[in-house]
C-alpha cells in the first residue's frame, strides 16, 4: 500500500481488483481508497475514489457487479458511530447515500464483518457482529427490494450465556 493504515476495510471485486478503504494512518483518519491489481504477475497500486467521509472500523463489500457498499464505522470528525450506508456506483464513478436505506436495523456499529452472499437467486450484503459500546450478537442483511435491513438472527443460542466478542473479520 502507498499509505500505511489500520482499521481499514477491504474487498475483492468481480474483476479481481483488491480495494482498501479508509482506516487510520499514523497521523489521521483516512477517506482514501487504494486499489491493488495484479497483471503479468506484478502488483500495481493506484488511488481509488475518496470516500464520502473518513471512517475507521467500517465494513466494505461488493453489493452487485456495479455497486459497492460501506456500512457502519466510526467517524472521529463527527465523534460518533456512522449512521450512513454509502453506495459506490462503479458506472458513474461516484458515491451516494440511498435515501431509503436506514442505518443497520439493530444500530450502528464498528468492527463488524460484511460480505456479499447468495440468498437463493439473489445476492445480499450480510453484516455480522461488531461493537457499539458492547459486543453485538446480531446478523443482518440488506434487502434492496424491501428497502431495509433484515435481522437474520443472533449469534448465540437461547439459554446459553452471551459471548462478548466484537471484532470479526472476513476476506
Feature map (PLM): residue ranges:
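Kelch-like beta-propeller repeat domains
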Residues: 1-171
Amino acid at each position: 500500500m502507498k499509505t500505511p493504515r489500520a482499521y481499514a476495510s477491504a474487498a475483492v471485486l468481480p474483476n479481481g481488483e483488491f480495494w482498501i478503504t479508509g482506516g487510520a494512518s499514523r497521523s489521521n483518519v483516512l477517506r482514501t481508497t487504494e486499489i491493488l491489481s495484479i497483471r503479468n504477475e506484478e502488483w500495481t497500486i493506484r488511488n481509488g475514489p475518496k470516500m464520502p467521509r473518513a471512517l475507521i472500523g467500517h465494513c466494505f463489500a461488493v453489493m452487485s457487479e456495479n455497486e459497492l457498499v460501506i456500512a457502519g464505522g466510526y467517524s472521529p470528525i463527527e465523534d460518533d458511530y456512522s449512521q450512513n450506508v454509502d453506495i459506490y456506483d462503479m458506472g458513474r464513478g461516484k458515491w451516494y447515500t440511498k435515501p431509503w436505506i436506514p442505518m443497520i436495523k439493530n444500530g450502528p456499529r464498528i468492527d463488524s464483518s460484511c460480505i456479499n452472499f447468495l440468498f437463493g437467486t439473489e445476492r445480499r450484503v450480510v453484516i455480522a457482529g461488531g461493537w457499539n459500546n458492547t459486543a453485538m450478537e446480531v446478523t443482518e442483511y440488506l434487502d434492496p427490494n424491501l428497502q431495509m435491513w433484515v435481522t437474520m438472527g443472533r449469534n448465540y443460542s437461547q439459554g446459553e450465556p452471551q459471548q462478548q466478542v466484537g471484532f470479526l473479520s472476513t476476506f
